[in-house]
């Protein structure tokens, strides 16, 4: 079952209202049909590339059920920690469908027996040799020279400059490695398709140099991620077809004349793939009137960190109430006493306690970035399945689980004390 692409995805509520009203809040809800539709669009856009492979960054949405869906849609798992690698294996990915690309890895992470390993720094080579035999194929991450299309590339920490990468490749060849892959990760939310054309140009030029100068076989060229999605109603997603066409033009101009026309082009998109497929459902717990009207909700910054950390905008709507007239500007806050509102200010229909709000486009780097500030347990996650039913795919964390690793573990079985000091269980019954 598939769903048509939403032209205004941040306004879409994919699950029926009655199902959402029955859920305990706060919770995340993901749309299976949207996940599959986006994966299919990506495959279609790059169908011109023989052997095209899309790699999903596990850190964007590390839920085994979602990972299984993406695996069924042909995605590979892109992992940056040993924990992500272990989760990918447990989610059914074969070792050949897992790419391990740690940055500043620990010795234990370098020892992970990944069949597809990417080095971010040439200096890692000696450390890698101490931990494990060199594989027959290694990936190298390029940090391209700043281009007018991605002028902030100078500040990115990902990868090696061309000279360092070529030196590392030559050293690999001397050590018996005959096959290398190339990848890049700008991670800047580049909306202009020309930025990806410029990135492809840098990757393909480097690939041709590896092939011509060192006789190395180039096994792939991965463009990484960074393709943005629309969060405001006035925006539209980056045009994946325009991005693909620009990359294809550079491929035809550089790779085919170099005899590299069979090298697969790859992507590592996270937000573009899953952001629209997730919402955070929350309930209004209180309303404050004043110079600034406030809505308190049961979700907190511990459930969704991105707006406070990065200043990202996420559309908010009221479940079952799309009135335009009589809207008020509310600051949407939580129960953790910090000066800034965690979810921003929004024009919303007048709300009362008990109203349900939907925070949109949180299917990437939403739940995965949750933390326990304020001793807030992680909320539950649900999947709206293609057959129209809801399934719990992660239960809410229990409060006692927050303390499970402490040396002195609090006793949550003890009766709570009343303000008078009398144990709750010993209070006389009324009447």
Question: Whereabouts are the PLM-identified features?
Answer:
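A charged N-terminal "starter" segment
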Residues: 1-135, 174, 178, 212, ...
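Conserved, mostly hydrophobic/aromatic
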Residues: 35, 59, 81, 113, ...
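Charged (often Lys/Glu-rich) extended helix/loop segments that serve as interaction or gating elements
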Residues: 260-431
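General structural feature for long, well-ordered alpha-helical segments within catalytic domains
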Residues: 15, 19, 31-34, 38, ...
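Flexible loop/turn segments at secondary-structure boundaries
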Residues: 62-65, 86, 147-148, 188-192, ...
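Active-site loop/helix belt of alpha/beta enzymes
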Residues: 134, 144-285, 374
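General beta-strand structural signal in soluble alpha/beta enzymes
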Residues: 56, 77-80, 100, 118-121, ...
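Active-site-proximal loop/turn and secondary-structure-junction residues that shape catalytic pockets
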Residues: 58-62, 83-84, 104-106, 121-125, ...
């Amino acid at each position: 079952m598939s769903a048509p692409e939403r032209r205004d995805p941040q306004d879409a509520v994919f699950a029926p209202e009655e199902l959402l009203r029955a859920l305990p809040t706060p919770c995340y809800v993901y749309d299976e049909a949207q996940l599959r539709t986006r994966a299919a669009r990506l495959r279609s856009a790059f169908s011109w590339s023989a052997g095209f492979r899309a790699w999903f960054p596990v850190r964007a949405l590390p839920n085994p059920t979602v990972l299984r869906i993406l695996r069924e849609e042909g995605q590979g798992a892109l992992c940056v920690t040993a924990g992500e690698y272990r989760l990918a294996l447990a989610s059914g990915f074969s070792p050949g469908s897992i790419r391990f690309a740690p940055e500043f890895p620990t010795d234990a992470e370098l020892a992970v027996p990944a069949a597809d390993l990417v080095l971010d720094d040439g200096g890692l080579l000696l450390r890698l040799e101490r931990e494990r035999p060199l594989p027959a194929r290694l990936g190298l991450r390029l940090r391209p020279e700043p281009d007018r299309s991605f002028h902030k590339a100078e500040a990115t920490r990902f990868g090696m400059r061309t000279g360092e990468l070529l030196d590392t490749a030559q050293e690999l060849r001397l050590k018996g490695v005959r096959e290398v892959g190339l990848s890049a990760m700008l991670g800047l939310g580049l909306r202009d398709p020309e930025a990806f054309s410029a990135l492809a140009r840098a990757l393909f030029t480097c690939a041709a140099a590896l092939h011509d100068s060192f006789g190395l076989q180039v096994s792939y060229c991965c463009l990484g991620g960074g393709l943005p999605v629309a969060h405001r109603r006035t925006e539209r997603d980056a045009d994946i077809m325009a991005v693909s066409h620009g990359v294809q033009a550079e491929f035809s101009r550089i790779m085919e004349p170099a005899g590299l026309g069979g090298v697969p082009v790859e992507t590592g998109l996270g937000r573009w793939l899953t952001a629209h497929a997730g919402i955070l459902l929350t309930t209004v717990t209180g309303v404050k009137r004043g110079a600034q009207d406030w809505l308190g909700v049961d979700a907190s910054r511990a459930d969704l960190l991105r707006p406070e950390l990065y200043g990202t905008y996420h559309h908010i709507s009221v479940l079952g109430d799309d009135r335009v007239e009589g809207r008020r500007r509310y600051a949407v806050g939580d129960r953790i006493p910090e000066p800034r509102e965690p979810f921003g200010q929004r024009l919303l229909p007048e709300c009362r306690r008990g109203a349900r709000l939907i925070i949109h486009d949180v299917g990437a780097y939403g739940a995965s970035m949750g933390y326990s500030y304020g001793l807030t347990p992680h909320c539950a996650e649900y999947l709206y399945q293609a057959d129209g039913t809801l399934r719990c795919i992660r239960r809410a964390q229990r409060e006692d689980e927050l303390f499970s690793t402490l040396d002195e573990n609090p006793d949550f079985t003890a009766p709570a004390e009343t303000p008078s000091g009398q144990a709750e269980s010993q209070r006389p019954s009324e009447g």
